[in-house]
Amino acid sequence: MKNKKTALGSVRKKRRKLQCIETFFQTNDLVTAKQMLSSIMQYAVNGKDWLKKDPSVILQFHQSLNLFIREGYMISKKKKKRKVNAASYIGSPMMKGSLSAKEYENPLLVFKRAFKEYSIQEFDYFISGIVYFSQQMYRYGPESNLVRPYIHLSKMLDAAYLMLERGIQKNDSKKVK
């Protein structure tokens, strides 16, 4: 008899740490991603005008943000197994971006806090909503609160970029009782 394992299951390779986030920042640098998110958010809340960018660019950004959110969720679940390398000297407060001092020291906290407050589905709903409302003029705007998910997503972008810069390692230290 033939082996009935699927090709995906039998050939599955170990994924590198932060591979989706690396890919996200290869296609969108941090500044561009935050500007795109900010402009989509502004047009979604405004309602009197729509974002006049190529819809394919916005759709690609929407899809890459969805993958980014899923990778962030996986990071938040593996928090105890990973540790971000120590921060170097902070030259100016602008280097921290939207992160607090504690979040700058440990960017994994950003993901833990974001997914403690919102689920993946709620982030998907938020991203889909702002993209939808930024693409058209409307009379009645979005129903839900858009500010909190936007702040979390902006912080996650900053934290993920820091994690890529510093590197991440497994936390092998065990607590002694």
Segments and roles (model prediction):
Residues M1-K177:
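Sequence/structural signature of long amphipathic alpha-helices
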